[in-house]
């Protein structure tokens, strides 16, 4: 009887090294314009779509390095049971393309969870949980997968926290997965976010499906647009 292969030990200070790489990726992404496409669907208990929301917007960097968002056409909505809130859209910008930069690392406890091959890439796996959540703060609770070669994050999966509940209202958030790909073979940017979850509202369970695509990355001042393969 042969013993199984022992999991490889992670490098020292893995979380801090990943956060350093994340800081570089985030700084690079702030030099790029891109398009964000959102599709949000309500589903019934048979999986049929009962209502949808769709929008496209360009995220643009100005010569003064200020970021603006320009809606392409008008959003289309046939949602019947759910109202998308300002917090939902803020999470699309800040949590679902989650970046664990060095200045964010202190907010989180990280636990090494081994290694895993993701789409042919050997990765270290970290569990990431908030140390505490202050009033009004939005954080990430989930897992990240980082390429063993350069510690670039290739996938995150989890949820924006906390759920927002009061006696009169509730704002619930689905579990999601965000996939990243390399830009110019260097920096790892989000290209696709997907969620398919059932939210336990007081009025009843509601299944939702969310797809966010980040495309047409173009470095400010460059003429070419970077295209990715569809996940």
Residue spans of the language-model regions?
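C-terminal segment of classical bacterial N-terminal signal peptides
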Residues: 1-6
